[in-house]
Amino acid sequence: MSTAELACSYAALILADDGVEITADKIQTLLGAAKVADVEPIWTSLFAKALEGKDIKDLLTNVGSGGAAAPAAVGGAAAGAAAPAEAAAAEEKKEEEKEESDEDMGFGLFD
């Protein structure tokens, strides 16, 4: 990560910690106060657009939590024997569609 990216991400974290809306102007102002001069304006606008409408504190508290994946696995196991039969039927349909799309288009590889 470059110095500009780190500076913008730290500025965004500071703004989020203070409960201030994250905008490109506020990031640029904070970088100016910290005397970080080598940040191009595109970085501040990219970070502001990427974090617009997102709760940074919520993102930080949920980093690495895999709680959402476990219920999906349990639900899939409870489906029983019907799921493999449906999966096999879906695979057969996909194979048939692939065969139709591989038709000869009038030119060969070595023509």
UniProtKB/Swiss-Prot annotation:
Protein's GO biological process: cytoplasmic translation; translational elongation
Post-translational modification: Phosphorylated.
UniProt key word Phosphoprotein: yes
Family the UniProt entry places it in: Belongs to the eukaryotic ribosomal protein P1/P2 family.
Quaternary structure and partners: P1 and P2 exist as dimers at the large ribosomal subunit.
Organism: Aspergillus fumigatus (strain ATCC MYA-4609 / CBS 101355 / FGSC A1100 / Af293)
Protein name: Large ribosomal subunit protein P1
Keywords (A to Z) from UniProt: Phosphoprotein, Ribonucleoprotein, Ribosomal protein
Domain of life (superkingdom): Eukaryota
Cellular component per GO, a single term: cytosolic large ribosomal subunit
Ranges for region Disordered: 84-111
This protein's record includes keyword RNA-binding: no
Role of this protein: Plays an important role in the elongation step of protein synthesis.
Pfam families: Ribosomal_60s
Molecular function GO labels: protein kinase activator activity; ribonucleoprotein complex binding; structural constituent of ribosome
